[in-house]
Amino acid sequence: MEFCDESYDLVNIDEFDALWVASRHGVAFGVPPCLLISDDDAIARSSIELKSGPSSSNLSPSTLSTEKTSSDSSGVICDPQLHETWREGLGKFPAKEHARKVARELGADHGIIFLLGQDEKYYEDSDMGPTFRQRRYFYYITGADFPGCAVTYDILRDKLVLWIPRIEPRTVLWFGKVPTPEECKAASDVDSVYYIDFLHEKQCPVFKRGQTIHVLHPDQIPPELDHLGKFIRIDAVRLKPAMDAARVIKTDYEIALIRRANAVSSAAHKAVLRNIKRFTNEREIDALFRGYCIAHGAPIQSYPVIAASGINASTLHYDDNNQSLKNRQLLILDAGAEVHCYASDITRTIPLPGSFTPLAREIYRLVERMQDECIAQIKPGVRFSALHAHACAVAVTGLLKLGILRGEEEEILARGTVAAFFPHGLGHHVGLEVHDVSGTERLLLNGGPGSGPGSGGGYGCGASTWRGYRLRRRVMTKRESLTPWEVAALWEGAKPEKEKQQERWLLNNVPLDEVEAALTLASSSGARGQKLAPGMVVTVEPGIYFLPRVLEKYWNVGGVRIEDDILVTKKGYENLTTAPKGDEMMKCMGESGLL
């Protein structure tokens, strides 16, 4: 091989993509020879650095990670009010505080909590995979957002240890480095950070005879326990409910992240409003929203963007986002970015022509009133089911005035008819999941019709066997939908004329077992969900939707939903969402200019 007047040494690494190229005159570039030899200590302390050369300064990590402050070809301009100084004074991720909360909820004074982080995933028959997403329970007590980790918490010794992978040089070359132990400790208040291969060794002192090991799921039992056999106890039942309960009340650090996610997402909603008259297809709205979030340091969405125009708005989780906006009255934009794994969840209903049609305005004002009145009642001690019942009452009053419903208000509420227009719960918790866990109680309803895995409420139990042990674990779903008879039970409670109510429901062809379950639900105050408490973050998202079988006149309206993220405070609430709505939204849509 000839290279003009120079001579080089070439070393292949993993096919042809990585070479060490050294000139005899001393100029070098590529992978330094020291990184071709496995040196775990060196890898822990350093990352690949480009050798000095005429163009290496242009490729420095600091340059590549600097956020743009001027417009690029997409037309997105970074808002100086959303600069990164929001993290100043935030401190370390409170992993230790979270671990202690879990131990308290667990009610254990000894034992080991063991959690596995997420590994890299690949699509079937492919060397490509989805974007990495850390397991949320693991992140809660570590703050570590990279693959291949584990964590142990010794409850008796109050010692929290993060276990991280060693990375081979060629992996660093292709995918970059992972944080070093020192960097992990600087970012999170874990006690120690070690390499995970030490955890795999039999002489590792973490797991001892006589201990109870708490795991989330039976399939996450560490293989390191094989040599201990029956000398340890495995509990795969209690940890998940304990962690769910701990996650319900957010720490100040968590609230700061949710507030930041709301700030970026609200600004992205405003950017869409200011450009609404320029769009011709739902996909353009989707693209602008996500692009704005990326430009402001929130590249991951909490859930797929819902840009549903016209009749698409009646599909709650519509995400095709590919329909023309021509002749569409309304757009529901349900979108929120996450920041450091913490979610936001924001919905706005936007008039596509720039102003509401008379029919659409009527429905929008009704939903706006439902939300305003419910938010105003939020404070500690209020049961969330009472807020939902109030939203239903406001909806029925409004629908009666519009002539959409006919009859007596009390009778309509008693029958649960409003569920045909407002079929989902008023809200849910927000945190590490957009539909976050709610602890041992559901936010709105506990039990009742449809309880169990994959349904709208309650618990289910799964069981597995490990080395002869029968391991039970509790499964809880998060998203709540409401049937007419559940709404009726929620509204009426237990009434003396129970048999008369049962007769009305049976005449409407409701199955007897579901009627009896709804009546049991109505008679139990403990089944009516959670009372709000300081530190909870919940959505308030009333909606009115129209289907052909309900009312053809409002079919083109599709649906209206307005959603904000609300922090429950000691004396009331704080609305974390600042995206314009109502009259402020209409004013924003009249503003001119780019983003």
Swiss-Prot record:
Keywords: Aminopeptidase, Hydrolase, Manganese, Metal-binding, Metalloprotease, Protease. CDD domains: Prolidase. Its cofactor is Mn(2+). GO terms for molecular function: manganese ion binding; metalloaminopeptidase activity. Disulfide bonds: none annotated. SMART domains: AMP_N (SM01011). GO terms for biological process: proteolysis. Residues 51-76 are annotated as: Disordered. Residues 52-66 have a biased composition (Low complexity). Mn(2+) 2 binds at D334, D345, E563. It holds the Pfam family Peptidase_M24. The keyword Protease applies. Its EC number is 3.4.11.9. It is an enzyme of class 3 (hydrolase). Catalyzes the removal of a penultimate prolyl residue from the N-termini of peptides. This is Probable Xaa-Pro aminopeptidase CHGG_02942. It comes from Chaetomium globosum (strain ATCC 6205 / CBS 148.51 / DSM 1962 / NBRC 6347 / NRRL 1970). The lineage of its organism: Eukaryota, Fungi, Dikarya, Ascomycota, Pezizomycotina.
